Amino acid sequence: MARARKKVPTKYRVITEAGAFADHEILMDKKPVYDELRSLVEPHLGGGRLMHVRVLCPLLDDWTDMFVDEMGALKRLPRNDAATRIFRNSFMSKRPDDDPEKLPYIAGTAVVFLRPVWEG
């Protein structure tokens, strides 16, 4: 018999390319499996396939997980400046002398979890 997995309150923020955001809270497994993350995240991405990005989140001042449409740039989705700042913050924390505009950007909607959820 399979053991029940522990569910914990989990907050996440959906950031649109227009800069608007919506905060959500759900109960999810403490260590969710890929399919659980996919079924939660991909609807926010307009059905796009999720791609994981480890980020240094300024809200938490700690490392956490962001998910974006893996084909966002190829689909020519609009640049998401708010998500790009979070994404680039990770690089700039380690390499402060780099030019941030030479780094990749986030295209389309992004989903940022306020706790680490990715085991990969």
Predicted segment positions?
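Detector for the mature cores of small, proteolytically processed
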Residues: 4-39, 44-120
